[in-house]
Amino acid sequence: MAGKGLKSLNEAMNALSIASKSCRALPMRQSSILPCRRSMASVATPPAANITRSVSEPWQPITNVPVTVYSFPELEPRSLESYSARHLHLPLRRDILHLAVIYEGDSTRRGMASTKTRYEVHGSHKKMSPQKGTGNARRGTRQSPLMKGGGKTFGPKPRDFSTKLNKKVYDLAWRTALSYRYKRGELIVTEDGLDLPLPNDFLWLAGGGKLSRELEDGYVRKWVHEFMTSLNWGKEAGRTTFITGDKRPNLFTGFELAGAEGRALELWDVDVKDLLETGRIVIERSALKEMIEDHQSDLVTRVAVQGLRQKGPNLGEVLVRAPRY
């Protein structure tokens, strides 16, 4: 068995040697090596020479904004004026507007609530019943807070609810509210003399006393409603606030009767909250200039250099004026 196994082993070794010699005799083929590349690889293409360019022009912020002055009630453009961007093109600051509205609300609180303490209630200060022997609870004077009609413990007294706010912050809130209206196209500037053009026939009849009070009020209320609806300024459009330099009889009387359509305010009676409540602001040109002049303390310095103080930006510089015929 052992000899038989050795014989088979020799035969296998001879076969392997013959196979190796035949492999050496065959010519070797040169295999071409192809470059490997990932199909999903990201290739960064070099930028073309005509695409790249250097920006040499500096950024120039907006310094002035145009304001169109209209005639009323025709709403025809009469002039084009220039206002500083620091007056009518400020970014919206809700925090500053909130501070201003809270400041105004606190200033309008009267704080007149007042109650009487036990020392201010009128009446005798005699003890109402003996301390002992009655079987009831101990009772002192009628002024005791425990008794009906007695004094109030820790009751309210007249106080001042007003808070403080830096004037420069408050002035900035005014111009921020105007800028918000201007950017949204809700600031309409008109020529001076803003008033409602009531019909002449009605004014003649009302001036002659030929109409009753109820008939006059009803006619004015209906006329104001139709007038505001025709301009899309009425109740359906969010109402309108008219601001004038002084009181105009037709304008103020009309909106006292038709308050659902809008309201009319004099310049001294306007607050920051009034500029934000209604759908739009219609203001006279002179009233707008005075409003901005009174609220630009953060733009005007008190320091004088060589006897001169820095003034605020220009207000309402006329660029174009329409001819009058």
Swiss-Prot record:
Q: Name one GO molecular function term.
A: structural constituent of ribosome
Q: Does the keyword Ribonucleoprotein apply?
A: yes
Q: State its location(s).
A: Mitochondrion
Q: Show the segment(s) annotated as Disordered.
A: 113-158
Q: Which SUPFAM superfamilies match?
A: Ribosomal protein L4 (SSF52166)
Q: Cite the entry's keywords alphabetically.
A: Mitochondrion, Ribonucleoprotein, Ribosomal protein
Sorted alphabetically, which InterPro entries does this protein's record hold?
Answer: Ribosomal_uL4, Ribosomal_uL4-like, Ribosomal_uL4_dom_sf
Cellular component, GO annotation:
mitochondrion; ribonucleoprotein complex; ribosome
User: Its GO biological process terms?
Assistant: translation
Tell me the domain of life: Eukaryota
User: Which parts of the chain span the membrane according to its record?
Assistant: none
Its biological purpose? Component of the mitochondrial ribosome (mitoribosome), a dedicated translation machinery responsible for the synthesis of mitochondrial genome-encoded proteins, including at least some of the essential transmembrane subunits of the mitochondrial respiratory chain. The mitoribosomes are attached to the mitochondrial inner membrane and translation products are cotranslationally integrated into the membrane.
Family the entry assigns: Belongs to the universal ribosomal protein uL4 family.
The protein's name is: Large ribosomal subunit protein uL4m
Source organism per UniProt: Neurospora crassa (strain ATCC 24698 / 74-OR23-1A / CBS 708.71 / DSM 1257 / FGSC 987)
Gene name, please? yml6
